[in-house]
């Protein structure tokens, strides 16, 4: 974008952001935002990457800062482009949002550990709260998580596993 007043070019490069899909017992960790944009809406733990910070490191840091949980960051879920704010300050801030699956490392309890977080909750795929922050991409991220939950292998019962392991008796 070129400023008409000073004829200076301003680049609207996407700012890298990282987030984590932390699940426990089939439920997903979400945080309620305490500040604009999207104050009061539910979001995944995440935020902007620090200069020269790898998105995996940023995802783990953001989870720790927002919830006090230590996580092991796993596979990438996907990347989405969006705007940081719907309008007003920050509306021109384009973001590249990179999401990872993550698992809890340790036994620590969640607690809002940041002024950016008003509340923390664990939600089943069919009971995700509303409103959601960042409607330009978060619903798609959550849909990807739900689809992965539906594809995940379900543990079979001990009886059926045992039956599969038995070798049939030979017939003579």
List PLM regions with ranges.
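Acidic, metal-coordinating catalytic segment for phosphate/diphosphate chemistry
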Residues: 1-19
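Unchanged
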Residues: 49-75, 80-137, 141, 170-172
């Amino acid at each position: 974008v070129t400023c008409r007043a000073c004829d200076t070019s301003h680049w609207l490069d996407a700012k890298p952001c990282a987030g984590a899909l932390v699940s426990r017992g089939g439920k997903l960790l979400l945080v309620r935002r305490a500040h604009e944009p999207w104050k009061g809406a539910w979001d995944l733990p995440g935020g902007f990457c620090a200069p020269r910070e790898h998105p995996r490191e940023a995802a783990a840091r953001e989870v720790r800062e927002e919830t006090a949980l230590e996580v092991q960051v796993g596979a990438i879920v996907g990347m989405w482009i969006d705007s940081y704010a719907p309008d007003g300050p920050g509306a021109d801030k384009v973001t590249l949002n990179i999401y990872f699956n993550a698992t809890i490392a340790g036994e620590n309890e969640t607690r809002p550990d940041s002024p950016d977080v008003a509340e923390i909750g664990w939600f089943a795929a069919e009971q995700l709260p509303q409103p959601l922050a960042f409607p330009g991409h978060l619903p798609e991220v959550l849909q990807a998580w739900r689809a992965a939950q539906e594809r995940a292998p379900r543990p079979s019962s001990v009886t059926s596993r045992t039956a599969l392991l038995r070798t049939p008796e030979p017939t003579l």
